[in-house]
Amino acid sequence: MGYSGAMSTLLSLRACLVLPLVLTALGACATQTELRRAAQQEQFARESASQGDWAQAMRSYAAAADNVELGHGDFAWQARLHHQAGRAASGACRYDAAEFHFRQAIALAKKSEHSSALSEKALESLQAGKPCGVPR
């Protein structure tokens, strides 16, 4: 093998070693970006809820929950966001969405070994037909 062939092999080997490290670093940056975005969306959702804009709060909490999942955030945070999305959906009279988010919150709370009692109670209250426009 000549000098140029050895150099070519060495460069290929180096690229094979460096590429996974670069891809891992980019993945970590993407994860942190998703989690930061989730925190911002959660804050926006809180502001919307405080102004009584339940539909926007529901969308923002749901988007935050999606970003926590994409960013590999913990199950407890995802559960809390889904619970809040369920409450906001209930306030917006979107019972189908509320039920979905409460069920997601219950499943995620169990995965995180945290209590799912609040979401279970909210789901029961939803099924009991409490008045529309009142968050659970």
Which residue ranges define each predicted feature?
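Bacterial Sec signal peptide processing site at the extreme N-terminus
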Residues: 23-44
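Flexible helix-coil transition and linker loops at the boundaries of alpha-helical arrays
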Residues: 30, 67-75, 110-115
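Residue signature of alpha-solenoid helical repeat architecture, marking inter-repeat boundaries
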Residues: 35-36, 76, 117
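The tetratricopeptide repeat
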Residues: 40, 74, 81, 119-122
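Amphipathic alpha-helical segments of tetratricopeptide repeats
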Residues: 62-68, 104-108
